[in-house]
Amino acid sequence: MKDFIEWKDFTFQYDVQSEPTLKGINLSIPKGEKVLILGPSGSGKSTLGHCLNGIIPNTHKGQYSGIFTINHKNAFDLSIYDKSHLVSTVLQDPDGQFIGLTVAEDIAFALENDVVAQEEMASIVEMWAKRLEIAPLLSKRPQDLSGGQKQRVSLAGVLVDDSPILLFDEPLANLDPQSGQDIMALVDRIHQEQDATTIIIEHRLEDVFYERVDRVVLFSDGQIIYNGEPDQLLKTNFLSEYGIREPLYISALKNLGYDFEKQNTMTSIDDFDFSELLIPKMRALDLDKHTDKLLSVQHLSVSYDLENNTLDDVSFDLYKGQRLAIVGKNGAGKSTLAKALCQFIPNNATLIYNNEDVSQDSIKERAERIGYVLQNPNQMISQAMVFDEVALGLRLRGFSDNDIESRVYDILKVCGLYQFRNWPISALSFGQKKRVTIASILILNPEVIILDEPTAGQDMKHYTEMMSFLDKLSCDGHTIVMITHDMQLMLEYTDRAIVIDNGLIVADDHPINILSNTELLKKTHLKKTSLFALADRLGISPQKLTQWYIDNQGGKNG
C-alpha cells in the first residue's frame, strides 16, 4: 500500500515558540518501508516522531497547517486508543516509558491492556526477554538497571504489541557497541517478519547501516534536505554540512582522496575497489606518556547484595591531564565505579589524591575534587530555567551576580546553549538537557571530571564542540574520564582505555591496542570501528591507519 503515512505541506509550531519547528513537510512512507530519520539537534526530527505517535497534539500543544494522514485517515483525528494500536514507540529516555514495578510487569503491560490470558502472557514475555537477553532481569525493578538494560526493557515492552508502525527514537543511545549491532539486527528481523513500517531516529549512522535501510530522510531547521537512498547520501557532503557524523571509513576515504563517483554501493566496505587508491606514508602509534599522578584508587569493591560484588577489588591510577575512557558491556559496573569515586555509594576503597588520603571525604568534599555528569540529565536537573540550572553551583558558592552571568554565558556558548539561556528546561530536547547538565558541572572547573556517555544524543556539531572543549580542559591539566559506548570517541579523544567486565578490570591499554584484541572485544561486547575493516581491505596496519586518521581529523589537543 502506497502512502501509508503521509505529510503534505505540513507545518507545526509549538504554542511556546515563536517560529514553526516543522516547515512545509512533504513526505510519504509506504507500508512496510524502513526509514532512517537524521538531523542535528533541534532540526525537527523528534517533533515529526511526536506527531506520529500522538504526543503532538495530545501532550505538546501547538498549531498546524497542511495534511498528515496515517492509512488515509487524518492522524490528529485519531483517538489515543486508536493511535496506540497503530504506533509503538521506543523513547529516547527509557525512564519516561516504564509502567510496571518489575521488568516482567513492564513488558506485559500492553498484553494486560489487551486482556491476554495469563499463561500466554507469561510465554510472550519470556520469549521477548530471551530474544533481548534480559531474561535474568525479569524480577528486577526497571529503575535499578543500567541505561542499556533499560533500553532493552523498553524495546521489549513495545515489541509485544505487534503494531503496524514501529518508531524508534535513538534506540542505540545507551547500548554498548555489540548490543547496538544486535538490536539493529533484531529490529531488521522484526521489520521483515512482521512487515512493520519502521521509522528510526538515530545519530549512530554507522551502526544503523549495519542492516539495510530503504531510505534516509535528512532534516535541518525544520525542513527536509535529503530524501533518498543511503548510498547516494554518502556520496554527498550533506552529512558533515548538516552536523551528522559520517561513518568512519567514509571520512577516512575522503581524506585519502577516494573517488566516490564510480562507487555504486557505499554502505559496505567489502564492495569498494581500492586497486587505484594511493596510500600515503603513515607513522607509528603514539603511546601514552604518563604525567604526574593525580589519583590512586586502591582495592575498590562495591556490592549491592550479600552474594555478588558489582565491583571486585578494582585498582588503578589517574594522571593529570589524561583522557581516560571506561568501556565495557551494559551492566559491567562502569557507572557504579563512577558513583563510588564520587562517594555516592558506600565502598571500602583507599583513595590517594595529590598524595593525600581522601578516603573519608564527605560527598561535598569529594565533589570539589571530582565532578560527575550523569547519563540521564533528568536525574540532575533541579531548576526550571536553563540559566538558573547552570548558575546554581556558583550561587551556592557565593559568586557575585556579574561573575555568574559572565561565566554562565561563556559556558553556554561553548555547549551550544546560549540561545536557550532564558528557556524553561522542560521545553528542551533530551540532547539539549544533556548539554545543560554538562555545562552545570563544567562551570565549577573540578580537577577530575567524570562524564557518563557525554555525547549520547548529540549531533556532530555539538559533539565536536563538546569534545574540543574537553580536550582544552585536558590541556589545561584537568583529568577527563569518560564512560562511553562510542568506540570512535574512545579512538579520537582518549589516551587510555580501561575495560570492565563483570566488576573486574580486564584490560588497561591504549585504545587502539584495546580494539586490536579480538578475543577481548568479543568477551566484553565492544566492537572494532570500520577503520579496522578498512585497514584490512587496504592491507595496512590498523594501528597506523587509526593514528593517521586521528592526525588528520580526530581529537588533537590532548
From Swiss-Prot:
Q: Which CDD domains match?
A: ABC_cobalt_CbiO_domain1
Which leading EC class covers this enzyme?
Answer: translocase
Principal subcellular localisation of the protein = membrane
Q: Which UniProt keywords apply?
A: ATP-binding, Cell membrane, Membrane, Nucleotide-binding, Repeat, Translocase, Transport
What is the membrane topology noted in the UniProt record heading this document? Peripheral membrane protein
Query: Pfam families, from UniProt?
Result: ABC_tran, DUF3744
The segment(s) forming the ABC transporter domain are 5-246, 295-527
State where ATP 1 binds.
Answer: G39, P40, S41, G42, S43, G44, K45, S46
* Enzyme Commission no: 7.-.-.-
Single GO MF annotation: ATPase-coupled transmembrane transporter activity
Which positions in this protein are listed as binding ATP 2? G328, K329, N330, G331, A332, G333, K334, S335
Membrane-spanning residues? none
Q: Where in the cell is it found?
A: Cell membrane
One cellular component term from this protein's GO annotations in UniProt: ATP-binding cassette (ABC) transporter complex
| Similarity comment: family membership | Belongs to the ABC transporter superfamily.
Read off the NCBIfam families from this record. PRK13648.1
User: What's the stated role of this polypeptide?
Assistant: Probably part of an ABC transporter complex. Responsible for energy coupling to the transport system.
* Name of this protein: Putative ABC transporter ATP-binding protein SAG1633
> What is the source species?
Streptococcus agalactiae serotype V (strain ATCC BAA-611 / 2603 V/R)
Source organism lineage? Bacteria, Bacillati, Bacillota, Bacilli, Lactobacillales
